[in-house]
Amino acid sequence: MNLKEFSKVVDLVRESNPLVHNITNVVVTNFTANGLLALGASPVMAYAKEEVAEMASIAGALVLNMGTLRPEEVEAMLLAGKSANANNVPVLFDPVGAGATSYRTEVARHIPAEIDLAIIRGNAAEIANVINEKWEIKGVDAGTGNGDVVSIARQAADELNTVAVITGKEDVVTDGERTIVIRNGHPILTKVTGTGCLLTSVIGAFVAVEKDYVKAAVAALTFYGVASELAAAKTVEKGPGSFQIEFLNQLANTTSGDIEKYGKIEELE
């Protein structure tokens, strides 16, 4: 595959400075906002039910993340999502911890039933639980399962009529027909809380400027993975604190040329 067509999306994000409306969790709010700013997007965190519909209507993308789940936030997510749908604003959903508790799983299945999603992004366990496939989960982490990640992703894309993104050691992007695997990234990402949540919001910035959502997601994942590799090369021996700071630097400094040089993607049959 031609990495150049994906790398161009990074430049487009930085030229366009898209507004990304995040209804995310309290653990990752600051990291998400700083990561989007470093990339070149414009983050807004608006949660009040009195304003979410209006804010979502003017955004380039809406990101719904249920990490620290409360009923009032679910209400706000539904209001924002329906407004985004009505105004042709792409909606991304991160079903954090789906399968961990019955309430969390119920919400993770209810939101896609009520809102048309451009992207759903999670680990294998989360996505499997959204579509009621058996996969063990540990807290909000992936746990273990016997399923085929590519098959789970394709099934989710088909059942939810969306682009499914499953992230892990390898990342899978599919709309049910096109399936692409991305092999960039670094294990130290798992030692910094919020890197998955930020990733969903970064995909949101890419989706805001590229309407081919498979292409946007692959571009975002490749960019994010390469940035993490470049950051780790400078800091991994120091530890996750140093990595987190350098990762923000690399979100600002990683170029389209870096993606073309270091990107590792494969389209599956």
Swiss-Prot record:
Keywords: ATP-binding, Kinase, Magnesium, Metal-binding, Nucleotide-binding, Thiamine biosynthesis, Transferase. InterPro entries: Hyethyz_kinase, Ribokinase-like. GO terms for molecular function: ATP binding; hydroxyethylthiazole kinase activity; magnesium ion binding. Transmembrane segments: none annotated. SUPFAM superfamilies: Ribokinase-like. The keyword ATP-binding applies. Pathway: Cofactor biosynthesis; thiamine diphosphate biosynthesis; 4-methyl-5-(2-phosphoethyl)-thiazole from 5-(2-hydroxyethyl)-4-methylthiazole: step 1/1. It catalyses: 5-(2-hydroxyethyl)-4-methylthiazole + ATP = 4-methyl-5-(2-phosphooxyethyl)-thiazole + ADP + H(+). The keyword Electron transport does not apply. Gene3D superfamilies: 3.40.1190.20. GO terms for biological process: thiamine biosynthetic process; thiamine diphosphate biosynthetic process. Its EC number is 2.7.1.50. It is an enzyme of class 2 (transferase). Its cofactor is Mg(2+). CDD domains: THZ_kinase. ATP binds at R121, T167. Substrate binds at M45, G194. NCBIfam families: PRK09355.1, thiM. Belongs to the Thz kinase family. Catalyzes the phosphorylation of the hydroxyl group of 4-methyl-5-beta-hydroxyethylthiazole (THZ). This is Hydroxyethylthiazole kinase. It comes from Bacillus cereus (strain B4264). The gene is thiM.
